[in-house]
Design a protein with these regions (language model features):
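PIN-domain endoribonuclease scaffold, especially VapC-family toxins
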Residues: 24-33
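Enriched for short, Lys/Arg-rich terminal
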Residues: 3, 12, 19-22, 59, ...
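A general alpha-helix detector
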Residues: 9-13, 30
Length: 91
């Protein structure tokens, strides 16, 4: 079982959504999958990122509600960002 390590930025992002119970319930399902190394179903569009986030993974928890993480392939996964495309990828 992997350890989930939330970054400081992820914690800030999480606070913005803490009152949206529906989104957080879906997020918890994804986090449990990551922790137990269960493959994330295709319906969440898990994929590798490029550019500034090369090597990181992303999935669509709900519509435009995204999770970005980095899997160290040891026993730790860094939870990096949480939010919409415009929030996470603005130039």
């Amino acid at each position: 079982m992997k350890k989930l390590h939330p970054t400081t930025q992820y914690k800030k992002d999480y606070k913005r959504f803490r009152n949206n119970r529906e989104k957080l319930e879906k997020l918890m399902v994804i986090l449990k999958m990551l922790q137990s190394e269960t493959p994330i179903p295709a319906e969440f569009s898990p994929h590798m990122l490029t550019g500034n986030y090369a090597g990181y993974m992303e999935c669509h928890i709900e519509g435009d509600f995204l999770l970005i993480w980095f899997d160290h392939e040891t026993d730790q996964i860094d939870l990096v960002r949480l939010g919409s495309h415009s929030e996470l990828f603005r130039q």
